[in-house]
Amino acid sequence: MNIMIVEDDYVIAKDLQSIAEAAGHRSVGPLQTMEQALAYAATADIALVDLKLADGPTGASLGRKLIDRFRLEVIYVTGRPEGVGAGLDGASEVVMKPFSEEQVAAAIVRPSGMPPAMTGFDNRILCF
Protein backbone atom coordinates (compact mmCIF):
# COMPACT_ATOMS: atom_id res chain seq x y z
CA MET A 1 0.00 0.00 0.00
CA ASN A 2 0.97 3.63 -0.45
CA ILE A 3 1.07 5.39 2.92
CA MET A 4 0.95 9.19 2.84
CA ILE A 5 2.71 10.80 5.78
CA VAL A 6 1.48 14.29 6.69
CA GLU A 7 3.58 15.52 9.61
CA ASP A 8 5.52 18.78 10.00
CA ASP A 9 8.01 17.47 12.58
CA TYR A 10 10.87 16.00 10.53
CA VAL A 11 11.97 13.43 13.12
CA ILE A 12 8.45 12.12 13.70
CA ALA A 13 7.77 12.08 9.94
CA LYS A 14 10.92 10.02 9.32
CA ASP A 15 9.93 7.61 12.13
CA LEU A 16 6.50 7.11 10.54
CA GLN A 17 8.12 6.65 7.14
CA SER A 18 10.53 4.03 8.52
CA ILE A 19 7.70 2.14 10.23
CA ALA A 20 5.58 2.10 7.06
CA GLU A 21 8.47 0.97 4.88
CA ALA A 22 9.60 -1.69 7.37
CA ALA A 23 6.08 -3.11 7.16
CA GLY A 24 6.46 -3.43 3.38
CA HIS A 25 4.59 -0.31 2.30
CA ARG A 26 5.66 2.58 0.08
CA SER A 27 5.65 6.05 1.58
CA VAL A 28 4.30 9.21 -0.01
CA GLY A 29 5.99 12.21 1.56
CA PRO A 30 6.59 13.22 4.22
CA LEU A 31 4.37 16.24 3.53
CA GLN A 32 4.00 19.22 5.86
CA THR A 33 0.86 21.12 4.80
CA MET A 34 -2.73 20.55 3.74
CA GLU A 35 -1.93 21.87 0.26
CA GLN A 36 0.92 19.40 -0.22
CA ALA A 37 -1.19 16.51 1.05
CA LEU A 38 -4.10 17.29 -1.26
CA ALA A 39 -1.69 17.48 -4.20
CA TYR A 40 -0.45 13.92 -3.52
CA ALA A 41 -3.65 12.37 -2.14
CA ALA A 42 -4.53 10.55 -5.37
CA THR A 43 -1.32 8.51 -5.05
CA ALA A 44 -2.10 7.17 -1.55
CA ASP A 45 -4.21 4.42 0.01
CA ILE A 46 -3.82 5.43 3.66
CA ALA A 47 -2.88 8.76 5.24
CA LEU A 48 -1.11 9.22 8.57
CA VAL A 49 -2.09 12.77 9.55
CA ASP A 50 -0.96 14.99 12.42
CA LEU A 51 -3.58 17.46 13.65
CA LYS A 52 -1.24 20.46 13.77
CA LEU A 53 0.67 20.94 10.53
CA ALA A 54 3.06 23.59 9.24
CA ASP A 55 0.08 25.64 8.03
CA GLY A 56 -1.70 25.49 11.40
CA PRO A 57 -4.25 23.20 13.05
CA THR A 58 -5.48 21.90 9.69
CA GLY A 59 -5.10 18.16 10.20
CA ALA A 60 -8.73 17.43 11.15
CA SER A 61 -10.01 19.38 8.15
CA LEU A 62 -7.49 17.66 5.91
CA GLY A 63 -8.52 14.25 7.20
CA ARG A 64 -12.16 14.91 6.37
CA LYS A 65 -11.22 16.04 2.83
CA LEU A 66 -9.06 12.95 2.28
CA ILE A 67 -11.93 10.71 3.35
CA ASP A 68 -14.65 12.52 1.38
CA ARG A 69 -12.79 13.41 -1.82
CA PHE A 70 -10.26 10.61 -2.14
CA ARG A 71 -11.82 7.82 -0.05
CA LEU A 72 -8.57 7.35 1.85
CA GLU A 73 -8.24 5.58 5.16
CA VAL A 74 -7.11 8.27 7.61
CA ILE A 75 -5.14 7.59 10.76
CA TYR A 76 -4.57 10.60 13.01
CA VAL A 77 -1.21 10.65 14.79
CA THR A 78 -1.33 13.31 17.47
CA GLY A 79 -0.06 14.48 20.81
CA ARG A 80 -3.14 16.71 21.15
CA PRO A 81 -6.05 14.50 22.21
CA GLU A 82 -8.26 17.54 22.78
CA GLY A 83 -8.17 18.18 19.02
CA VAL A 84 -9.35 14.72 18.09
CA GLY A 85 -13.04 15.09 18.92
CA ALA A 86 -14.10 17.13 15.89
CA GLY A 87 -11.84 15.33 13.45
CA LEU A 88 -12.36 11.72 14.45
CA ASP A 89 -15.50 11.36 12.36
CA GLY A 90 -14.62 8.95 9.57
CA ALA A 91 -11.07 8.25 10.72
CA SER A 92 -9.89 4.65 10.87
CA GLU A 93 -7.74 5.16 13.93
CA VAL A 94 -6.13 7.65 16.28
CA VAL A 95 -2.57 6.95 17.44
CA MET A 96 -1.27 9.04 20.34
CA LYS A 97 2.24 10.49 20.46
CA PRO A 98 4.56 9.25 21.69
CA PHE A 99 3.79 6.10 19.75
CA SER A 100 5.46 2.74 19.39
CA GLU A 101 6.31 1.05 16.12
CA GLU A 102 3.78 -1.65 16.99
CA GLN A 103 0.95 0.87 17.49
CA VAL A 104 1.52 2.50 14.10
CA ALA A 105 1.98 -0.82 12.29
CA ALA A 106 -1.23 -2.20 13.85
CA ALA A 107 -3.16 0.92 12.85
CA ILE A 108 -2.02 0.57 9.24
CA VAL A 109 -3.15 -3.04 8.92
CA ARG A 110 -6.44 -2.73 10.85
CA PRO A 111 -9.25 -3.66 8.46
CA SER A 112 -11.46 -0.91 7.10
CA GLY A 113 -14.94 -0.82 8.51
CA MET A 114 -13.97 -1.56 12.10
CA PRO A 115 -14.90 1.10 14.67
CA PRO A 116 -12.17 3.71 15.13
CA ALA A 117 -9.76 2.91 17.91
CA MET A 118 -7.78 5.33 19.99
CA THR A 119 -4.36 3.76 20.39
CA GLY A 120 -2.17 4.93 23.22
CA PHE A 121 -4.83 6.31 25.55
CA ASP A 122 -4.76 3.31 27.87
CA ASN A 123 -1.31 3.95 29.32
CA ARG A 124 -1.09 7.74 29.52
CA ILE A 125 -2.28 10.40 31.92
CA LEU A 126 -3.76 13.27 29.95
CA CYS A 127 -3.74 16.77 31.42
CA PHE A 128 -5.71 19.65 29.93
Where on the chain are the PLM-derived regions?
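Conserved acidic carboxylate
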Residues: 7, 78
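As written
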Residues: 87-96
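C-terminal output helix
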Residues: 95, 99-127
